[in-house]
Amino acid sequence: MERLIALLREMGIPFAYDHFAEGESPDPPFLCYLLPDSGHFPADGRVYFKIEEVRIELYTDRKDPAAESKVEAVLDQHGIFYARSEVRIESEKLYEVLYSFEMEGNNDAQEE
């Protein structure tokens, strides 16, 4: 999680986990991130290697290639392979660009 937070800070866009509190959402662009699933690798009846699914949602009020480039540059710089999709949320008058990828979880407890 610390690595993910460092990546988000490096992007230079305001972010929150899942959503901003009511009335505290910044003006676009902003990011929301989620850890909706895991694909842990088992061995000997326990979690041997933790893998987290990560979703970073970029919200903008118009198509914003500069904001997308900020996110993608950081992911690319750190060698993160991601899938990207985009949708217009008409009810919110926002664009959402979704970046999905897997990231190593906290594996500090592994025996060497």
Task: Report the location of each language-model feature.
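Long, contiguous binding/interaction regions
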Residues: 1-53, 59-112
